[in-house]
Amino acid sequence: GDGTVNEVLNGLMQAQKEGKRAALGVICAGRGNDFAAGPGIPEDIPGGCQALKADQRQWIDIGKVTGGVYPDGRYFVNNVGVGFDAIGTIEVAKLPQWGMLSFMIAIIKTIFLYYKGPVIKIDYDDQTLTSDTLMFLTMNGRRMGNGFQMAPESRLDDGLFDLVLARQVSRLRIFSLIPHFMKGTQGTQPEISTWRAARLSITAVKGTLPAQSDGEILCVDGTRLEIEILPRQIEVVCAAKKD
């Protein structure tokens, strides 16, 4: 799953510091398997084995996040999320592996458990934005939650994160936004802003930051995160070469 991919990624980066390099290969057997959608890795086990055998590779960007329980930094490959999705991550971990159903149950629970998000300040590429927020995503990959198209135009090798800000809305409005996130059309909605950046920091102005990275909890009451992209840092074994 994505959490295991994250752990292996951090091991590969430690090996790089010691002068050793290896490619990242993935056989999908987790709850979400969202990273795999980016480089075209098959989400079934036989397909994943065939991809490893074919050994076609792609250089991809990764991210590094500093803060929370990782004051010295932690590498990630798919995303960092602040707010609603981090609470959802905690809730989905309590459930059996039921695929999309697990994530939908967790979302519904989170809508009622976690309603008022923090006010955050986002500093990115010499610009600053302060906003109330339901959820703020730093996406390297495209997908989260076993199929939600959070950043449908994201590329793993463009040297940029796709940023998604969902402002605070009513509970009823959250329900109506869910289909847009499933289809990747959330950018058409007035409460959603999307843009790109290579480096950013997130600071809690009011409230605290619950945050996750690749489905693993970074903090539940953090105050600041710093995030940067590392272009084309590792090789991934993928199903087919990407243009």
Question: Which residues fall in each region the model found?
Answer:
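Short, well-ordered alpha-helical microsegments
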Residues: V5-N6, V220
